[in-house]
Amino acid sequence: FIRNFTHKIVQSGLFVLFFAELWERFCYYGMRALLAVYVAEQFTQGDRSAASGMYGAFTALVYALGFFGGTIADKYLGYRRAIIVGGVLMAAGEFMLMIPTEEMFLMGLAVLIVGNGLFKPNISTLVGKLYKQGDARRDGGFTIFYMGINLGAFLAPIACRWVAGVMGTGGKPDYRWGFIAAGIGMLLGVVTFWRGFAALGDKGLPPKGREGMSSILVVLFGGLALAPAVYMLLAKAELAGYVTLALLIGILLYLIGYGLKSDKVTFQRILALIILLIGNIAFWASFEQAGNSLNFFARDQVKWESTDNFPLGGTRGELKAADAQSVTLPVGFARALDGAKASAVNITVTYPSPENVNIKVDATAELAS
């Protein structure tokens, strides 16, 4: 069964897209895990508000440019070439983040944003192109594809932060090496995708009349020409907010206009898409706190001490509160304790000294029936 299942994945090209997207998400989430904290420490003299503004502008522009990347692939490049060009630009942007000047850092982010706009929407579309409408394997294919996304996003913060810690000096991480690790991951994704062209068959080829290299060069240089405009928006985070809002309104009007000109079924699908987009705004605004406010909270309130270089704090990792000698952790799920069913558990850890650690467990419990 496993051999037949794997054979179908490889033959369909899903294997190639799985690993290409895994490495692209490794690149993005590895960089994102370090971005806000690095900006605060390197460029804003510890000002979280300014660092958060730049982070917000970055994420807003990442999502906004995906719309244009998909349009360019449809009309000019085709999905394959858009993915390759986007991946190369993302890797180049990551490597530019290594340069410790604010100007080059912002330009690196701008190049990365343009590259992500070409890569991200088109590889997801290419997964859909692998299956005909109504194919029973379609849902399973997207499930496997999203497993690659989640795996890359899970591994990236651990690996990139570990590299930054290993390459740092004086107990302080050098986040620039984390960006390098993310860029190398992106290059691995590009190579994986390029080497797997044969498994994709005729999927993702450029439109007729656009097969030459001229389309690639136009988009590549056009993307590089767009980077300075993105740079300006990153440098002026408040302006980026207004521009992103204008883009959102423009995209919504475009979709509505396109739907009104189309048949009834297409219009209904576009209307459903718009409703989902409204919900998505609230979700992603909350989700992106993982790379922003939650990152600062983890940095300031949690400290890992280790005797070795193991990524998660070593075999003797000691979790300490930053400004206290005790921490209470509420656990909001049922847990069996000595025959009782606990509805809430408070775990208090006190450590007057590293050699004297006390753990006290208080539980609100009911007798198990």
Model-derived segments and spans:
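C-terminal ends and interior cores of transmembrane alpha-helices
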Residues: 41, 85-106
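Intracellular juxtamembrane helix-capping segments at the cytosolic ends
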Residues: 118-133, 291
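Disordered extramembrane loops and terminal tails of multipass alpha-helical membrane proteins
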Residues: 1-8, 108, 124, 196-369
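Helix-loop boundary and gating motifs at the non-cytosolic
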Residues: 8-59, 275, 284-297
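Central cavity-lining transmembrane alpha-helices of secondary-active solute carriers
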Residues: 55-75, 120, 151-156, 184-187, ...
